[in-house]
Amino acid sequence: MAFNEDVGALVIDNGSGMCKAGFAGDDAPRAVFPSIVGRPRHQGVMVGMGQKDSYVGDEAQSKRGILTLKYPIEHGIVTNWDDMEKIWHHTFYNELRVAPEEHPVLLTEAPLNPKANREKMTQIVFETFNSPAMYVAIQAVLSLYASGRTTGIVLDSGDGVTHTVPIYEGYALPHAILRLDMAGRDLTDYLMKILTERGYSFTTTAEREIVRDIKEKLCYVALDFEQEMSNAASSSALEKTYELPDGQVITIGNERFRCPEALFQPNFLGLESVGIHETTYNSIMKCDLDIRKDLYANTVLSGGSTMYPGIADRMQKEISALAPSTMKIKIVAPPERKYSVWIGGSILASLSTFQQMWISKQEYDESGPAIVHRKCF
């Protein structure tokens, strides 16, 4: 199918925490906003404000005091389609200011996304938004493309879920994908808890956002946790201060590395699962012997919860301890990894060789939503 070359494709990466959207060929998303939909708690509390029945993204975030906030994407999977439609509508009309019926749309999906979900996504894009063409790509695969590779294992950790996804020659290997229901949101909650132990109280959803900011600005991963704990106990060199919106200044010490340590020791959160290093190793071990070497040498970090300073060195150390002693291990942590899923989508959708891969409206009309399984894999 030949598109008018000047009409750029749209790339939308829907994460549990943030939606990243923009134009294929750009090197960064134009719009990044929270994946939330808010509805007024009390009818008519803002008389004459021209009150809407729902708010999306930053506007919902700023009016959170009078709204009930919902996340339509939980653990990477869309669970509320009405709200998801609102987020897409907001993306097209308010953030990107485009007419969806004029642009092909590339959407992303979580690894192991249920079949019915991919079909529903496809149906909404064609029937509600009348797009001329669309494609659904697996998030981790796009991150790998963004790093300039087609074979490797991606550790993708965002706000709602963490996956380890082995990929060979551009195809994810579903039998070896592992999912960990522990990600950024859990780390924020954990930091709220351990700051409370220090005597600072953070309880409301509004205060959770403050703690998320503290986490993003001050947390790091220790290379040796026990050693770091004793360093923190014997000196105040690791302490940092943070000014709260009301002007109060708080001090944070070992919490800085205790919080993200939960990625390696989920028992800190009361979870039974193994850490991200062991999950990555287990994922590699589920793959064919012949490709393991390529996976160890191309371990790519992706997503906002891999942004902690020190995480790549720690992964290198932990995986080296698990792998055969002669194995070459390389952890790739691109500086732009917070957006590498989106960037990979931008690269893919602008390749000339990709243009025949789009599902066209015509193909959809002939075959229905199931076409997505034949054309996107």
Swiss-Prot record:
Top-level EC class as recorded in UniProt: hydrolase
Pfam families: Actin
Domain of life of the native organism: Eukaryota
Family affiliation: Belongs to the actin family.
Gene name tied to this protein: ACT3
GO terms of molecular function: ATP binding; hydrolase activity
Record-listed E.C. numbers: 3.6.4.-
Catalytic activity: ATP + H2O = ADP + phosphate + H(+)
Keywords: ATP-binding, Cytoplasm, Cytoskeleton, Hydrolase, Nucleotide-binding
Role played: Actins are highly conserved proteins that are involved in various types of cell motility and are ubiquitously expressed in all eukaryotic cells.
GO CC annotation: cytoplasm; cytoskeleton
TM annotation in the entry: none
Main subcellular location: cytoplasm
Subcellular location: Cytoplasm, Cytoskeleton
Family matches, as InterPro entries: Actin (IPR004000), Actin/actin-like_CS (IPR020902), Actin_CS (IPR004001), ATPase_NBD (IPR043129)
Protein's name in the database: Actin-3
